[in-house]
């Protein structure tokens, strides 16, 4: 299933049940190794600990056809307590996340770490269903389709539950260079 990548799904980078990248109420910065992109997002919610979540991510190398990332950057901050929609600018793919927790809002601000691959362009984009399915539930998003890449997300925020639901924006990438600055 993941033959293009040269190693099976079980060997995702740092992806295990107990390997959280943050403690509750704690900020974190997570970046995939160079040349890899985020392919899985896992999270558990804890109402008693500030209605916060612990997070874990998995990365996978992009296929050789995409080449090496030509540049990487942190996107604009998405504010705590707000609903938002963001894709990586400049046709970038998501290769990491950065987040800070705000006690006053019982929520987090978010930033995507994005990498651009030469002049490749996204197409055939779609949005996943909500993760988690209901506020407060465990979240486990795995991209089983290895020719689709995460380009961003849209989130809703519940003022009652103080939790967020995510829909991830997944796209294919062209096999050729194209001239569009941003899609």
Swiss-Prot record:
GO BP terms, alphabetized: cell adhesion; collagen fibril organization
Q: Which GO terms describe its cellular component?
A: extracellular region
Keywords for this protein: Cell adhesion, Disulfide bond, Extracellular matrix, Pyrrolidone carboxylic acid, Repeat, Secreted, Sulfation
InterPro entries documented for this protein = Dermatopontin
* A matching Pfam family: DERM
Got any disulfides in this one, which pairs? 32-59, 72-114, 88-115, 121-178, 125-171
What residues bear Sulfotyrosine in this entry?
5, 144, 146, 148-149, 176
Its biological purpose is as follows:
Seems to mediate adhesion by cell surface integrin binding. May serve as a communication link between the dermal fibroblast cell surface and its extracellular matrix environment. Enhances TGFB1 activity. Inhibits cell proliferation. Accelerates collagen fibril formation, and stabilizes collagen fibrils against low-temperature dissociation.
What name does this protein carry? Dermatopontin
* Organism per entry: Sus scrofa (Pig)
């Amino acid at each position: 299933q993941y033959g293009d990548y040269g190693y099976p799904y079980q060997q995702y980078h740092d992806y295990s049940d107990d390997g959280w990248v943050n403690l509750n109420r704690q900020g974190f910065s997570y970046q995939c190794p160079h040349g890899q992109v985020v392919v899985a997002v896992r999270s558990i919610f804890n109402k008693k600990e500030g209605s916060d979540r612990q997070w874990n991510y998995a990365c996978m190398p992009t296929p050789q056809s995409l080449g090496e990332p030509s540049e990487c950057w942190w996107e604009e901050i998405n504010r705590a307590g707000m609903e938002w929609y963001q894709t990586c600018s400049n046709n970038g793919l998501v290769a990491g996340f950065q987040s800070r927790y705000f006690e006053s809002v019982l929520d987090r601000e978010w930033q995507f770490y994005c990498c651009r691959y030469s002049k490749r362009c996204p197409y055939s984009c779609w949005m996943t269903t909500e993760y988690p399915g209901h506020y407060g539930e465990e979240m486990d998003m795995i991209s089983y389709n290895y020719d689709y890449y995460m380009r961003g997300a849209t989130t809703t925020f519940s003022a009652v539950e103080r939790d967020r639901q995510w829909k991830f924006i997944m796209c294919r990438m062209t096999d050729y260079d194209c001239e569009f600055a941003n899609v």
